[in-house]
């Protein structure tokens, strides 16, 4: 029996709700999608709950689920994945945080949680922090530049814990929070104290940085604090190949996703021009996926632009991003051949563009197979049509479904 290559395309934050600016259509409805529509002739569509109905997923927990790992078992916080994706090498016992370069006033009240989001000087600032803050109370500190305004911070040493609260207040106009222990332990208390010392040291370094003086002169907001959240102890995950028997690769420019995929043992490629934002080079990602499909059984293609547009409330940009993803689908199918490929297209969660945050809504999902199936005869691929389709699954079902339809699944039982 022929075994087919598998391509999983995730448009981050794809799911949406009717949008007033689109006369009640969702962005997926409004987008022109000729390549995706052409696949409907031999596809099943439906809805996926990344975690379970009504649960609002993080991008971390949803991707673990989609890759077949129950987040209730394997999730320990986002910080470690962000750090791995930003290039950190972690060892057992390290505690990692995800964070934002942000703007605060002299009273440490947050003015901009993302320092304008587009932070071209991030590498310079990370270098300066690493040169001037090496350790606190015998615990080594290391900073890693993430995507756009994001940064990861890793603590290495004895007697530290991930059971500490965030310093990120999550809203502008509020003061940077003091980290507090979340359990009654010496390790948690010690770690919270280290984080609070770190917050002040980071502010002192960044507030006097020549980089930020230059930004102010140019009329930009200074990136003068790092807001921390998502503390996580590093734990080793099983490799994707160990439970799927697939040789796997991924295309992504987003630190979190790269970190998860690397930890799962996938070959992760970030092509030149891929940014993890709205301005990403879609064609470069398509070409990378085409090349990886030559040598791998499974290729995961992640595109962040849809989520970035949603978080910023940019309706037209989300529609354009979906249309550009459609061109990616067409380019890959034309080059690889529709007879050689199982293709799944979905989102990792919904980010309604008028809400600007993740939601617990189910996400539309499409599964194309190159041989005769009982297809859904769908007229279009969108949230409304998906409700009429045959698929009603959880994220945890995705990997098994792909293995089944690619003729790679093993029998369960005698």
Swiss-Prot record:
Which of the seven top EC classes does this enzyme belong to? isomerase
Any GO MF annotation of the entry: phosphoglycerate mutase activity
Q: What is its EC number?
A: 5.4.2.12
- Give the GO terms filed under biological process for this record: glycolytic process
For this UniProt record, the keywords arranged alphabetically read as follows: Glycolysis, Isomerase
Q: Which reaction does it catalyse?
A: (2R)-2-phosphoglycerate = (2R)-3-phosphoglycerate
Cell membrane as a keyword? no
Which pathway is it part of? Carbohydrate degradation; glycolysis; pyruvate from D-glyceraldehyde 3-phosphate: step 3/5
Report whether Translocase shows up as a keyword of the record. Answer: no
Q: What InterPro entries does the record tag this protein with?
A: Alkaline_phosphatase_core_sf, ApgAM_prokaryotes, Metalloenzyme, Pglycerate_mutase_ApgM, Pglycerate_mutase_ApgM_sf
Q: Which family does it belong to?
A: Belongs to the BPG-independent phosphoglycerate mutase family. A-PGAM subfamily.
User: What HAMAP family does its record include?
Assistant: ApgM_A
Q: What does this protein do?
A: Catalyzes the interconversion of 2-phosphoglycerate and 3-phosphoglycerate.
Classification via PANTHER family:
COFACTOR-INDEPENDENT PHOSPHOGLYCERATE MUTASE (PTHR31209), METALLOENZYME DOMAIN-CONTAINING PROTEIN (PTHR31209:SF0)
This protein is called: 2,3-bisphosphoglycerate-independent phosphoglycerate mutase
């Amino acid at each position: 029996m022929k075994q087919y290559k598998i391509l999983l395309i995730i448009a981050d934050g794809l799911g949406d709700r009717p949008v007033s600016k689109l006369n009640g259509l969702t962005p997926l409805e409004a987008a022109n999608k000729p390549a995706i529509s052409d696949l409907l002739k031999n596809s099943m569509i439906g809805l996926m709950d990344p975690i379970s109905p009504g649960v609002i997923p993080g991008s971390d927990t949803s991707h673990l689920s989609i890759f077949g790992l129950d987040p209730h078992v394997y999730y320990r916080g986002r910080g470690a994945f962000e750090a791995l994706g930003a290039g950190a090498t972690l060892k057992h016992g390290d505690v990692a945080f995800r964070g934002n370069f942000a703007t605060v006033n002299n009273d440490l009240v947050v003015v901009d949680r993302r320092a304008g989001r587009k932070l071209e000087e991030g590498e310079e600032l990370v270098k300066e922090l690493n040169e001037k803050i090496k350790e606190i109370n015998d615990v080594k500190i290391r900073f890693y530049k993430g995507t756009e305004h994001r940064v990861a911070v890793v603590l290495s040493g004895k007697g530290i814990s991930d059971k500490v609260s965030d310093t990120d207040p999550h809203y502008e106009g509020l003061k940077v929070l003091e980290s507090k222990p979340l359990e009654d332990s010496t390790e948690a208390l010690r770690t919270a104290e280290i984080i609070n010392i770190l917050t002040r040291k980071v502010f002192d370094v960044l507030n006097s940085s020549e980089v930020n003086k230059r930004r102010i002169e140019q009329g930009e907001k200074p990136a003068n604090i790092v807001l921390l959240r998502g503390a996580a102890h590093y734990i080793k995950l099983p490799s994707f190949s160990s439970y799927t028997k697939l040789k796997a690769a991924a295309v992504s420019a987003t630190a979190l996703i790269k970190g998860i995929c690397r930890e799962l043992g996938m070959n992760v490629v970030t092509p030149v021009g891929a940014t993890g934002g709205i301005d990403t080079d879609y064609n470069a990602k398509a070409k990378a996926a085409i090349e990886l499909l030559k040598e791998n059984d499974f290729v995961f293609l992640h595109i962040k632009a849809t989520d970035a547009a949603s978080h910023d409330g940019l309706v037209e940009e989300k529609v354009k991003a979906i249309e550009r993803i459609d061109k990616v689908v067409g380019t890959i199918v034309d080059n690889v051949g529709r007879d050689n490929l199982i293709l799944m297209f979905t989102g990792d969660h919904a980010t309604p563009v008028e809400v600007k945050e993740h939601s617990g809504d189910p996400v539309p999902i499409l599964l194309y197979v190159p041989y005769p199936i009982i297809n859904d005869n769908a007229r279009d691929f969108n949230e409304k049509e998906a409700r009429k389709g045959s698929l009603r699954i959880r994220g945890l079902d995705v990997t098994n479904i792909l293995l089944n339809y690619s003729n790679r699944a093993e029998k369960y039982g005698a």
